[in-house]
Design a protein with these regions (language model features):
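Proteins enriched for Cys/Gly/acidic motifs involved in redox and nucleic-acid/cofactor modification
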Residues: 1-209, 224, 248, 263, ...
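Residue-level signal for inorganic ion chemistry
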Residues: 42, 77, 104, 201, ...
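Short, solvent-exposed loop/turn segments at secondary-structure boundaries
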Residues: 52-54, 175-180, 210-216, 277-280, ...
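Conserved SAM/AdoMet-binding glycine-rich loop
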Residues: 72-73, 81-82, 193-316
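Glycine-enriched alpha-helix->loop->beta-strand junction motifs that scaffold or abut catalytic
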Residues: 91, 254-261, 329-332
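Short flexible coil/turn linkers enriched for glycine and charged/polar residues
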Residues: 147-150, 160-161, 259, 269, ...
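Contiguous mid-protein beta-loop-alpha structural module that forms a pocket-lining wall or clamp
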Residues: 314, 326-331
Length: 445
């Protein structure tokens, strides 16, 4: 078997990062990425919505048709939630749960031995999916080769204990499990030594970091430890729930400029009645007060969020309240999701389930408000100085640009010429010139 592989990732940034770690793991073992003619195909799935499940099923069928001889492995959250449904599709060789992804090289080897020595007509997949609720220790996908990028993701936590009434994630990710503090520090040292200037702390519920650790560590403790490391230019925080902003965390954000002025704080609904029905345990007033306080401490902070529309029982009056509340927050970006009914969650059996047409119509209306807010936020940086961390060279309409992000996570494009020096991985002072679809076109200061 030629050691060529392709990997397809669905879902959140954590899942994307885990997919990157999987690719690095296989590369470190002598495998080569070859998307055109792979002998191994890995599909790293998401199951947060029914649409995500459907996309994964469609991709499985298409890739099996296109690559009938390849070993096809399906892993991740959908595999964890319903391995039997995936097996029923046909053509899947390996199914691995969330925790078993790190064992994929072993599973591929075992499957190939099994196929060689036993009945070639046996179409049953090799399945390894452990009960996620029993997991008590953080496991990361260990990869020896660290990719040379300007930004690196450090997964510090997995799992969630919130059990919001609409959410399947605690059922497929399990309880909160934290990367031990010293391991987080050592992994960050390796990333900085490899040239990464920005570290992004990621996880499913990073505000709960340390809850399971024996020494009482928490997210502020970890942040303070990482900020002592030489070479760390930016520290970006992943998604943090509103209730997880302790006084210590707020003080750190105010005092430490290397913590990026970019906070993703899930809202989920802008109506108190809906928030209560979701089991979110805060009010719109508390959320607004948090944003107001953080914005006063660092005025140019980009606040981003997630919002669900069409939750069971959401009336037009509830939605109108949510629409007005989101408009008032003036957030830098909002990810809008129509509610997706997930079997096994309390919301799936709630009365007053809304039609897809109502959910789609409300999502479109809220998206327009969110885009207006985002454009106003970006506009204020035209003519202002920003720091661009160069990430990659891109071609757009025949022109070359250095693409990267500012500390407040604006997507920036710097036009390049043939004489432009090598700028990837460098931190550059730039000035905003004009808006483009996703961010700002900039020039060197």
């Amino acid at each position: 078997m030629d050691k060529t592989f392709a990997i397809y990732n669905f879902g959140c940034k954590v899942n994307q990062e885990e997919g990157g770690a999987l690719a690095a793991l296989f590369s470190s073992l002598g495998w080569r990425q070859e998307p055109e003619q792979p002998q191994l195909i890995i599909i790293n799935t998401c199951t947060v919505t029914a649409v995500a499940d459907k996309k994964a099923r469609n991709l499985i069928r298409r890739l099996r048709r296109e690559h009938p001889q390849a070993v096809l492995a399906v892993c991740g959250c959908y595999a964890q939630r319903d391995a039997a449904e995936i097996a029923a599709i046909g053509g899947v060789d390996i199914i691995a749960g969330v925790d078993e992804r790190r064992q994929l090289p072993r599973l591929v080897e075992a499957y190939c031995r099994q196929r060689h020595h036993h009945d070639a007509g046996n179409n049953d997949p090799l399945v390894e999916v452990s009960p996620i609720a029993t997991l008590r220790h953080f496991h990361r996908i260990a990869a020896d080769n660290i990719q040379p990028r300007a930004r690196a993701y450090l997964k510090i936590e997995d799992g969630c204990d919130q059990f919001c009434k609409y959410c399947i994630i605690p059922h497929v990710r399990g309880p909160v499990r934290s990367l031990p503090l010293q391991q987080a520090i050592e992994q960050t040292r390796l990333l900085l030594a490899a040239g990464h200037q920005e570290i992004v702390l990621s996880g499913i519920h990073i505000g709960a970091y340390g809850r399971d650790l024996p020494q009482g560590e928490d997210l502020p403790t970890l942040i303070k430890s990482l900020l002592t490391l030489p070479g760390l230019v930016r520290l970006r925080l992943g998604s943090i729930e509103p209730q997880q902003f302790s006084e210590q965390l707020i003080s750190l954000f105010a005092e430490q400029e290397r913590i990026c002025p970019h906070l993703h704080i899930p809202l989920q609904a802008g109506c108190d009645r809906t928030l209560e029905a979701m089991g979110r345990h805060y009010t719109t007033e508390q959320y607004a007060q948090l944003i107001e306080r953080l914005r006063a401490l660092r005025p140019q902070t980009a606040f981003t969020t997630d919002i669900i529309v069409g939750f069971p029982g959401e009336s037009e009056e509830d939605f109108a309240a949510s629409l007005a509340f989101v408009a008032s927050l003036e957030l830098a970006d909002s990810h809008i999701f129509p509610y997706s009914r997930r079997s096994g969650t309390p919301a799936a059996t709630m009365p007053q389930q809304l039609s897809n047409s109502i959910k789609s119509e409300r999502a479109a209306r809220l998206n327009q408000v969110a885009e207006n807010n985002a454009q106003r936020y970006r506009q204020q940086f035209v003519g202002k100085t920003l720091d661009l961390l160069g990430e990659e060279i891109v071609e757009i309409s025949g022109n070359s640009y250095l693409r990267g992000h500012s500390a407040n996570y604006l997507s920036l494009l710097l036009p390049l010429t043939e004489r432009s020096p090598h700028l990837q991985g460098q931190l550059l002072p730039v000035r905003g010139v004009e808006l483009y679809d996703e961010g700002l076109i900039v020039e060197r200061c």
